[in-house]
Amino acid sequence: MDGPSTPGSRPPDYSLPSYDDHDDSPPPGHHQNINPAAIRLLTSVEGDPYDARPYVPRSPDKPSSPEHTVKPSTPSDADLYPEPLALKKDAKSTCATPEHLDALKRQEAGRVPPSPAPIDAQTAPSTHHSYQELPKPKLKPARASTVKLQKKSHSQPNLPRCAGVRASLPVIPEGPSARKSALQKSSTSCLSTPQTCPNKENSGSQSDISSAQPTQRRSYQPSIMSDYSRHDTILDPPAMPPPDSTYVPFQGRERRTPSPTRSSPTRPWSRMSNDYTRPPPSTMYEPSDLNGSPRPGTPSSRYGGSPRRPLPPAPLFSNSARDSQASFADDVTVSIPLDHDPDDVFGPETDISDNRYRKNSYVSQDTLHDDREDDYVHDDNEENDQQGHYGPAPDGKQERRGVRAPQMSRKEVQLINGELVLECKIPTILYSFLPRRDEVEFTHMRYTAVTCDPDDFVDRGYKLRQTIGRTARETELFICVTMYNETEIDFTRTMHAVMKNVAHFCSRKKSRTWGELGWQKIVVCIVSDGREKIHPRTLDALAAMGVYQDGIAKNFVNQKAVQAHVYEYTTQVSLDADLKFKGAEKGIVPCQMIFCLKEKNQRKLNSHRWFFNAFGKSLNPNVCILLDVGTRPGGDSLYHLWKAFDNDSNVAGACGEIKAMKGKFGRNLLNPLVASQNFEYKMSNILDKPLESVFGYITVLPGALSAYRYHALQNDETGHGPLSQYFKGETLHGQHADVFTANMYLAEDRILCWELVAKRDERWVLKYVKGCHGETDVPDSVPEFISQRRRWLNGAFFAAVYSLVHFKQVWTTDHTLARKILLNIESFYQLLQLLFTYFSLANFYLTFYFVAGGLADPKVDPFGNNAGFWIFTVLRYTCALLIATQFILSLGNRPQGANRLYLASMIIFVIIMMYTSFATIWIVIYQFSNDNIHLGSNVFTNIIVSVLSTLGLYVFMSLMYLEPWHLITSFVQYYLLLPFSICTLQVYAFCNTHDVTWGTKGDNVMKTDLGGAIGKRGGTTVELEIPSEQLDIDSGYDEALRNLRDRVEVHSPPPSESQLQEDYYRSVRTYMGRDLDGCQCHPRHGRQRSLFEHRHW
């Protein structure tokens, strides 16, 4: 737009005048602040380029004649400091001719000396020759008016009047002025004898001023110049930071030795200082921190945003001396310092006349490396000695530099339907990189303080965003993610997988239900059980996604205790398991999220009551999916789960395949506990779930990955139904909460499955979806594994008893006769399985007794010398004593307090199982080496057929499913840990049927740490403390990001002294009981009868 420009066609620091037809001068008092981000709007430019002729540099040893100086026609700031070589166009100005260009070239070469012509008062002094010597130029057509951002005057130029004004100006004398002569003389003297030049510490007199290049004469020089009233010139040298500065200047240019006749161009903002002091941070730019990163901003930042937002890097040769006075007015003349500063040039101990704006020459920069450098270092050492030591470092946690603590202010807020509902702006950084900002759901987070029971959520008038305003939508899929105290890694693993599944729904373009806007039909609800139990880093992850903001929640509203804090936001970013942001560039689509943070810890069943009875009743979804934090569903698992309901209208519930998380390259399988659970999960998904799906009744839909049809869960007109039975265990208190019911509701998902299938006058079935799979983290330590299985075994046992007792309900349903018969067959199968589980401990001991005792026979003894008999005798008494020890441990010790005892028991059981397996293999080999093999043989039937019917079934079904890898990686671990699972887990579960508490004691006290909303004006408004401004919201967001980036660990509180002492006393009691029991055992003398002697057993 400015026309072609070639290197060297313009002088350094040359800038075109404003795009206008007239001379624009700002109004009085207008700040001409140099803004690097300023934008000039230009719509049309006609005519030749403004700066058409090339720039010819002048000879530095010859001062320019006064005829060459152009004076502006309007008194403004530019009059005080005219721009070098910036020519103003006028209506009568002449253009450059070939003759004129030739004369300039000859003048540069020294062939033709300059011959200034006399100045006529009626002609514009804009050329080097008189108007009569040049040919008459060809007039150009008038330019069209340009559009600009500043307001301009519409008056046309009056050329005769301008000529009269120029005629009234005083005649400029020829030759250099006295001030310029002094400058040149000072520069010459410093170059000739640098040692004799004055060298003051903070000198600001004109004697120190030297210039490497002559400039135009200034008509006015103020006594004290403010930073904003001064225009930059080419005389400003580049700033050289002191050695202790962390900002490294630009090194791209070739640094040359300055001379009076040659000087490298500088930046218009460059300033320099001879002081070895760190410049104060500016409001616009700040130097890098100790790590080389941009220093966070301050509240006085020009961005007005977060104090932790990184500012842009400083410009080339930047210095903060100019910006240090930004708080003063533009027309300031004398600044009154608030505190005494020895470096303040306007301080009380300095003379104002000697501290004008300094322009140091290049010579002063070069002398930094000569003999005077020692003087500087000596002065700095003396100054440090005078100041003394700063003292010892402060103790304790220090406030991070540049951080602005969030400030709270009391504000009066209008209540909505008598309840506290706030619309909070999202942090500025999060808003800056959002792809969509067109709706309030993207720009504001909605907070609701719920003060009622979840069953009364809708009746009390609470609303969700999906039911009000422009965001009112139909919900097809409602996803529940329950959480307790899981870490941010577990949360982000699950949440990122859910958001990828939402993106998969939107990618199905041909679907009649889904498509590009499919995310509007999906709502994700996160329910956290207990505000004081949630992991702080998990809150930081939610805050990073924009769902949560600290400082908004309150404990009570109008003297009513808050039961749950509900946050609503449609996020467009996700955090993966590595805590890295993923957005639209990775295929992430918007996701409607509801975060329900319960005030009290009331167990998982209460979380589901909030999900179904509060939020589900408000949204009325079609399908509800239940997930646990830590479970990672596959990329399209949720779609396959939803598709099962879409294909069959009789499906009331469905589940997918749960896999144990094996880690990278399967390294988690090196832990025997993880490997055994992996084999157990795989065989359950291969044998149990498909068989139960054929019958139509799956005994348990795992809460880690399952789905239900919301319509099928509803109660009938009398209030009886699946949900009423499901939440019955939460409302049982006192004498009504019997032990049987309390343990049964430890596995409440089993009760829900039975109530769905046996619902009166309905024909609902449950289905297993093979295409849906999810990975979950399994316990990897013995105490955690025992505690988890205690709830599972007790819940499964009592729920199976419940379904067997109420099996007659099947005949009241609307199922077909064939389906009813199949359900009764399945009930009989469950009865057999229940009996086998109940007597599994005796079955294990009998198996060990007869199989391992088979090696006690001298005919089969592989060791000889009757060694098999003695080995079996030792293991027999060890096994009996170990089983008795499990009862003592289960009745008196916690798994966390008796970790060593349980670990020792597991090792001994593994040894016993290894010897039993060896005995089995040896007996099978011995039988095949004998010719008397027939099917009626007791040994052949009891050993070989039983082994083939169990292990062979595992191998055959795994090969049929084309998934045999768990047989290779996990079968051995599972087989060896079978005695530990049968004896230890089974005994501990039945010995702790009284333990049905979830640690909710003392949660009935209302907390006041968050503050409250106090009612005003008859209860229509409340007064509460909230963040005072946007900067406080940004500070909390930056704090959350820093915690996630630094991976700040949250240490769990150690066990109390009383708990440790109690565990110690219980361990001593267990040792005494074990020793007493062992001392009463006496071995029976005599030869052990082997299995081969019991021919008719």
UniProtKB/Swiss-Prot annotation:
GO terms for cellular component: cell septum; cellular bud neck; plasma membrane. It is an enzyme of class 2 (transferase). Coiled coil: none annotated. Pfam families: Chitin_synth_1, Chitin_synth_1N. It is found in: Cell membrane. GO terms for molecular function: chitin synthase activity. Residues 59-70, 99-109 have a biased composition (Basic and acidic residues). Residues 1-407 are annotated as: Disordered. Glycans are attached at N485, N647. Its EC number is 2.4.1.16. Keywords: Cell membrane, Glycoprotein, Glycosyltransferase, Membrane, Transferase, Transmembrane, Transmembrane helix, Virulence. Belongs to the chitin synthase family. Class II subfamily. Polymerizes chitin, a structural polymer of the cell wall and septum, by transferring the sugar moiety of UDP-GlcNAc to the non-reducing end of the growing chitin polymer. Plays a role in cell wall integrity. Plays a key role in pathogenicity. Likely contributes to post-penetration virulence. This is Chitin synthase 2. The gene is CHS2.
